[in-house]
């Protein structure tokens, strides 16, 4: 390790201009070691970035979210990230994960879909009639997150995350001017996504350049002023000590100020004609200040001043997306030092300039942006064969990709065309260029990020520098990279489908080494099998690399100890436990207020004024329009609890699983333990009736006494359907072959037709997937790559049928469209039955890491 560190230290000195004449002095050597540690850290733990291009800006329940993912090495922005698996999750307004995808990354690309229809397709088993049991999703703000397992080492702030409004499905087909959210009480846990704290109106935050003010030293102070929704207040005037502050944009600005105890150190803002004063941060008696001039095209100039501190050698580093781009030490002239940096010698993007002592203490830090060598020069121009299209008419579209010199580029793009008659998206406005170069390295709301790339004139440069000034969050922690803070790798890079875990002794919770672990993974139909064996290391760890497969497979792990001692083998089977390290799921985060703030929608077509054909409500059962009601049993709403996924995660953490009653008690306060024995459960003070389901090959025998159903081990349960309507049993028709002879549902139907009863259907796991009765083994499942659906586009070349309607909002989607040698990519599709305005946008990353995006609006001229 010391040898590698020395090599990187020398490389850092050569690359970044360390020409200090006293290189052998210990202070300089120590400072250089911090810089070398940063370089080594980035080599051993490189970060990755993800950007998702979506087909639309907002959605309605029942629709599908289509996305194309770009995975890059964060430092170079090249599509060469070492991770080969991307996880994409859909989270409800409450923070529950309702859909997830595990996608194979090839050359930095993958794509998929997330359905906003719940998981109702799972619940057809066991029903004899055509009832449709729905685990209904609720409208609200949904979050899509994407990350690799390696990204989890750096915290969820590094994930890709976007929040979408998901509206109720329109009550009249195609009436997307209806944008409604419905709040519905469910049985779900009270542990929902927390709300962000409401801000004062207005809220002003001050950010001294470099991190702190020092008495008697002039410093630039950035400020940001926002309303109670976290959005910038643009119409603002400000002054300090009677002097007007200029260059305020999107509520952000800056000014020069020399703190002095004699001054009032306040800034006065005028908002909506009202004046209000805000006190500046208190100045330190001693310390360092950092001031940079980033207005020049070629060089960055940095001025450092100190006051009241003991003279010592100070190091300076610049980190760009984890890359050590610069290292040197300051040369003091009295209490001032100066740095000149050639911006052509550092990467383009967000830079982190850090000043630090030989003990690794940060004395000043500042973000700035470098436009030089920007990799975003790829242009995507989108054109169509006509300026406007009739309903159902064929559309011929061409996307042309060129470099800044106009040279055609062969590459893959993702292309979306949508109905633009209703503009109902949120505040998100990033594209692939602005996200990977700017927004992903910052935190908080950035209004119109494209503005900062429009020009390099003084106005744009000052606005961008003010944006850099008001950032408190750091994607790249200097202390961690420099080695002054501990860093533990908890999630390893995945270069394919792997199974890794640990074997430990349950009685004394210690790892077991030299244990032979045999693995057998097989497809649900048993046609495909993979088998391997390994021996655990000193930490009890094991790892298997599998060939690619899709969807869930059964997995059985067998333990043995080939040392010839029969007693050891028996003890192993009784005491050993197997944990599997699965990629941990995302945690619930607090939405920023700007993420759920909706601008006023724009509707470009006349809306209907006739009464809406509302959905029918039958004894709290939702019956969709157009469905013939027979015996009021077409649709039943339920809550689905996916026990298998949760119990496997608990097992892998070494937690006790418990039984069905204990599980439900933790899910919601409305579930109650009637006798405080976890034998009888109630919901809304009414006893719950459990219905165990019976299937061939399941873990249960011929009979399960109903009175004991709540005591069923979680390990035996696949999922639970809970019907929160007390009369659901009147409409529930279960197949007799899937019911036990003494099922309480039979008695309910025959004798208690008007009695309130809450039903919980318990679905068993397959016997091959249950561990509890197999000593020295672990039966579970292993998740393969997710199967990806193709986007459907109708063909109207023979004209639509009479009376046919088509209200598709996404008209065309291709996540992987290739351009030819002339840089052209052609797309052919058909308009829907009404669209007047189309919006098209495209994204790309070339193999050389060049970024490109393009968009256009196709509409008739007025």
Located regions from the model:
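A short tyrosine-centered beta-strand micro-motif
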Residues: 124, 142-146, 265, 351-353, ...
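Extended, solvent-exposed regions of the mature portions of secreted/cell-surface glycoproteins
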Residues: 91-92, 113, 136, 315-328, ...
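Glycine-centered loop-to-beta-strand initiation motif
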Residues: 69, 99-120, 125-132, 244-263, ...
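Contiguous segments within soluble domain cores/interaction surfaces
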Residues: 24-48, 53, 59-60, 64-105, ...
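Surface-exposed, low-complexity/disordered segments
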Residues: 41-45, 56, 60, 81, ...
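Local beta-strand/beta-hairpin segments that build beta-sheet-rich folds
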Residues: 96-100, 159, 245, 323-327, ...
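Bacterial Sec-dependent N-terminal signal peptides
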Residues: 1-33, 125
